From Swiss-Prot:
Signal peptide: none
SMART domains with a match to the protein in the record: MUTSac, MUTSd, SMR
Regions crossing the membrane: none
Keyword Magnesium attributed: no
Protein name (record): Endonuclease MutS2
Lineage: Bacteria, Bacillati, Bacillota, Bacilli, Lactobacillales
Main EC class the enzyme belongs to: hydrolase
Amino acid sequence: MNNKILEQLEFNKVKELLLPYLKTEQSQEELLELEPMTEAPKIEKSFNEISDMEQIFVEHHSFGIVSLSSISESLKRLELSADLNIQELLAIKKVLQSSSDMIHFYSDLDNVSFQSLDRLFENLEQFPNLQGSFQAINDGGFLEHFASPELERIRRQLTNSERRVRQILQDMLKEKAELLSENLIASRSGRSVLPVKNTYRNRISGVVHDISSSGSTVYIEPRAVVTLNEEITQLRADERHEEGRILHAFSDLLRPHVATIRNNAWILGHLDLVRAKYLFMSDNKATIPKISNDSTLALINVRHPLLSNPVANDLHFDHDLTAIVITGPNTGGKTIMLKTLGLAQLMGQSGLPVLADKGSKIAVFNNIFADIGDEQSIEQSLSTFSSHMTHIVSILNEADHNSLVLFDELGAGTDPQEGASLAMAILEHLRLSHIKTMATTHYPELKAYGIETNFVENASMEFDAETLSPTYRFMQGVPGRSNAFEIASRLGLAPFIVKQAKQMTDSDSDVNRIIEQLEAQTLETRRRLDHIKEVEQENLKFNRAVKKLYNEFSHERDKELEKIYQEAQEIVDMALNESDTILKKLNDKSQLKPHEIIDAKAQIKKLAPQVDLSKNKVLNKAKKIKAARAPRIGDDIIVTSYGQRGTLTSQLKDGRWEAQVGIIKMTLTHDEFTLVRVQEEQKVKNKQINVVKKADSSGPRARLDLRGKRYEEAMQELDHFIDQALLNNMGQVDIIHGIGTGVIREGVTKYLRRHKHVKHFAYAPQNAGGSGATIVTLG
């Protein structure tokens, strides 16, 4: 499509309306390059993406993308084997993190059915190993100590040396206070110095680094810290060298993945642009138009996007209609209507929402041409008419049946009779070539052309004779008429003069009366349509209100049912606990046999109501939330024992996880790390202990293995285990606690010592575990 139309209709200003919604530099670059497309499938794809984004906002109310810098130049430098600085690496780290977040967001999406965006989400790739390594770069663009063991060693020494220097200088501040101009430690050329009064400069031995502008203060590095400062200088040089080595290593890690990272960055930017299109559509009450396959245009309540308070108008350009001729006086809004049509087409063909109502339809043109405004060329010494005619000739040479042509004041700038004839001839040529055209003119001769010629329609802009001002309402099918007599009368021109003027133009009076009747009919039709739209809007509001009330009622009902169930469950749980206590006491007194106790417990449990929770929305949602908190590859974590951040890279067969923490790879169990994004701790699941029943102490005994348990968890399992053993009349059990630090072993001993049903306990023989296991005799 020709670029001149984009300048004429100020399409770049339209694109700037989307800038406030963008978060990434990549999306800004894509918006800058956005131009109208000429292939319907590509336009349809863009519209489908906006519809998909609308689904996300309807279901989840938001779609967050963090601010991302452009990394295109950094990736080019990587391809040229250059090393990146820390700010460039930080920008890439954010892209990797945002990619991982977006993948997780997509995996958690519910109740959405995408047409186009799914392919974008699924083409995103994550790099858990790279993310883990890049945790060594914090959000402030600083390398953390754990980036490498050498860097950690250097910084530890640096901290110690600086602390010693500060301590020495702090002591000197107290001892030499009368010699100092200020009671502080200053810094000159990276060295710690004291501000000494010039008169006492010989009282403190050391190196002079600076003198104040007044000459009253000398900045001296005391001899006591010279060696330490030299050491600090060397350590800082070592630190810079090690940081450079780490940045080189990080750059080498990225090089094999440049193409994939570039693709991820583009996808994130494109998603950001789609998000901006949706937000623009939502804030401006715009719509996604349908695409016609027969050059039909239907714009309902279309508005000019660059006007602050635009008047909405309907415009219908049917398949058979070749030209619309807007006639009438100037300053009525004819040019605005012409530009509104052009911009609606440019926006639609660029994949942008159109400022119109739902049901609007656009066509797909290979080119849009316009001759709008005074384009007189001073350099070419052309008159207004010559300039317009030169441009029109160019348009007629290039336009074809897949073009849209817009003419403003066609034939103006020359003799009215000749200008009108030229305008009609040009329109007739375009009509015979089946080129859709909209033209504005103030020549009355073109009204007759619009009435008498097939596939050509007149139109005009409404004028309020009461206020003597245009309303900017588009009246399709009604030619424009002159309002000169009405305006002259209202402005005080003598009635006899107006009457005489009317008699002089008597031949046109019948035409004006017909036009006046058409205007009245059009206004009446519009009033009826407006009333129908008002009723329709009221019905929509009522429908939304009913749906809202129903949803609120359903939600409250679910809450009440859940509350009732919980209260009932609490009563049942209380009864079961009481029954356990009673049965335990009976068992202690040997009044019941074990199988009778088990039967009795089964009968009591039958008293609990069996509630089908499979359809409970509240519980199902809770289960989904809980399930979503399970660790996944690519999750950011904090290693509990070290307090360092890392990223999960893979899960081993035994359930343990491999994580990348800085440049170190670690193997962790689930309880040795926490997820960074988890907002609430998961409840610990009740664990069941399988107990082997036995009637006496002979044969295999029940065992409880407490190795690897935390202290509180181990004590809870031990208490439950002993209760089960007593309930099942077991005479002897084994408790395996290991040796380790001895904490759990000591806890087991204390527990058994104070339990009234434990007759005897002792460590197992050496061949059966020794001090790592305890044999307990119950009775």
